[in-house]
Amino acid sequence: MFCNNLLLIIVNMKYSWVVYILCCSDGKLYTGVTNNIEKRVNAHNAGEASKFTRARLPVKILAASRFMTKEDAYRLEYRIKKLPRNKKLQVLKVE
């Protein structure tokens, strides 16, 4: 049930907002939005970003996708968060 090491990143620097999915140490998934993915993942691993990940350290980036607007990023985050785990993994093509 733990996440494998697959990392999918679509990078284009003109896009400033990132929707990311983290794999926690217990195999649970966490989805979020940021404008600085490196800083945000470091904050998660320092226990400073969310209560959910603080109890499940360390975390790894499983997937990330960049967007031009904050609104588009939050729309995708909302859609992903509504999905059950198996659907998230299907969307990401992760086992």
Question: Model-derived features: where do they sit?
Answer:
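GIY-YIG nuclease catalytic motif and its immediate N-terminal context
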Residues: 1-48, 54-66, 71-81, 86, ...
